[in-house]
Amino acid sequence: MTVFFLPRRATHFAWLGCFLGLLTLARADQVTLFPSADATLIELKPTNSLGGATWLAAGLTQNGNTNRALMKFDIAAAVSAGSTIVDIGVRVSVTRTPVDGNADSLFSLRRVLRPWNEGSNLPADSQYPGLGAPAQLGDATWTHASWGTNAWTIPGGQEDVDYAAGFSASTGIGGIADYFFEGAGLITDVQLWLDHPAQNFGWMLKTEEEKSIFTARRFGSRELEDAGESPQLIITYLPPVVITNVHIASNRLHLTVDALLGYSYAVESRATAAGTNAWTTLTNFGLIFSPGPRTATDPLTNSARFYRARRN
């Protein structure tokens, strides 16, 4: 009898890939990521870009012009497919406020719904660095997600088309300091992006009070030499659930899962590794109130059978 579990993307399942072998014990892990790309959208100069600057701008300036910032993180490169996201924090650092006065406001992170490119432009005018420089092909601008090829639905992006209608998280932002976003919405976003990397277009950072002047802020970008002021995504996750022990006893196959408190576990089987055949529940351990190993058993047969462990 051959037993296989193979890695599978976009699920919270782990498939065992061994012949009566041992796999790694599931545990909670944490990783901190810096952006893989970030950029500023500049209403006053809608065809300019600023992807190479050491800051991001968001909010309404004293002159009534809006800036919005974009940032994305390569989650799939840092977290194993099939992991369960349990907590998310996003940290941003305000590095500058308006010179002539400032107003505190609620800032939000909204999931971006279409691809965009960072670009590498630096300010063209040192006297007005926030205006960026004429966009190069592919740069994110106020009018384009990718200059010359992919326009926003409306300049600055349209809610519910270019970016989510509701925010994933929000926090009040005032003076020069570090600020944190957290909450269930961010967990949902990151889980989605881990399970479906092609949908990971990151977040838009914007004030929710775009009619209030002096809410503009500069935030550290990924280009800063001091990464301590760059945006950070802190991910706490459970690696894919695995079957930690497989052995034969009393003419039965025994498959053990290390179960964590507060999650439901099951072991399932079917006759083929791929395809659309339904999985049959071998043992449903239900919600775990006392953590520790749980073992499912299955009679030995002459036919191949495939098993997976599932955590909800």
Where would I find each of the regions flagged by the language model?
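Bacterial N-terminal signal peptides
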Residues: 11-24
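Flexible, small-residue-rich N-terminal segments that precede or flank a structured functional core
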Residues: 28-79, 160, 164, 209-213, ...
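A short beta-strand element within beta-rich, extracytoplasmic domains
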Residues: 73, 84-97, 233
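Extended, low-complexity, turn-rich repeat/linker tracts enriched in Gly/Pro/Ser/Thr and Asp/Glu
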Residues: 93-103, 211-213
